[in-house]
């Protein structure tokens, strides 16, 4: 036999394998929320919740008119603070790595913050449970073995609730979770024909008066009670993702 000596050669390309992230356009629904960036240095922002309207009298013959106070209310909103844990980058890494380690770390911090802020935002918008002015509507479609699928009848029920509350037709936003998007794609030809993600603002389509978006970071609800899981709670088999609508 023959004995040969050789040198194993390796090369570092600088190419990076990154984790999948939510595409920026998939967060287009966040751009539809009015920003109050000028107040973010405060712990709490106070809004005024306008009370009822005055009574309107038609062909009134009784004088003097009744005096009715219109009472407004303070609506405080506490702000969340988001931080990322520090990540060390050594001099050896800066000089030895075949890629820009500092830029990579900064990008991961920005992406992680963006993901968490979006998830917290949609969780905060979603109602805790069904109540007057904040309806929670259960889906009524066929069972897939774990939950009832979403149908156009459920979307119409949501529209009826918004109509009853007097929500203006313009700027009604519906953020569908991927489960509900797939339900509608599977059963509703009209939705399938209109399903087309706008690469600029992330909107899928406009149907039944809603600008519809798709986002998979929506909160979970307990199916039997219709109550939202607390932020950070681990969902069980009896829980399901929800879609969230707002104005």
Region spans (language model):
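Extended, solvent-exposed, turn-rich assembly/linker loops in the middle of proteins
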Residues: 131-204
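A broadly conserved detector of short glycine/acidic/proline-rich loop/turn motifs that flank catalytic sites
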Residues: 51, 83, 180, 216-218
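Short helix/loop capping segments that flank catalytic or ligand/cofactor-binding pockets
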Residues: 55-58, 97, 183-186
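Residues that form generic nucleotide/phosphate-binding pockets
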Residues: 15, 19, 112, 158-161, ...
């Amino acid at each position: 036999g023959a004995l040969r000596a050789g040198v194993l050669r390796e090369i570092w390309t600088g190419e990076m394998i990154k984790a999948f992230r939510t595409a920026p356009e998939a967060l287009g629904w966040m751009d539809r929320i009015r920003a109050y960036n000028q107040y973010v240095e405060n712990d709490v922002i106070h809004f005024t919740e306008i009370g009822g309207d005055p009574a309107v009298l038609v062909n009134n013959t009784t004088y003097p008119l009744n005096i009715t106070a219109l009472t407004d209310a303070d609506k405080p909103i506490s702000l969340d603070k988001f931080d990322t844990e520090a990540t060390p980058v050594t001099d050896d890494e800066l000089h030895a790595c075949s890629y820009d380690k500092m830029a990579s770390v900064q990008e991961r911090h920005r992406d992680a913050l963006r993901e968490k802020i979006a998830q917290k935002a949609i969780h905060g918008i979603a109602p805790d449970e069904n109540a007057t002015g904040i309806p929670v509507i259960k889906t009524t479609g066929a069972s897939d073995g774990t939950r009832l699928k979403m149908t156009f009848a459920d979307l119409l029920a949501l529209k009826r609730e918004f109509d009853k509350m007097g929500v203006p037709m313009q700027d009604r936003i519906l953020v569908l979770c991927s489960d509900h998007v797939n339900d509608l794609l599977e059963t509703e030809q009209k939705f399938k024909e209109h399903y087309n993600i706008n690469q600029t603002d992330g909107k899928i389509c406009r149907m039944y008066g809603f600008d519809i978006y798709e986002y998979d970071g929506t909160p979970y609800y307990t199916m039997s009670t219709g109550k939202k899981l607390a932020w950070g709670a681990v969902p069980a088999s009896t829980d399901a993702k929800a879609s969230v609508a707002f104005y």
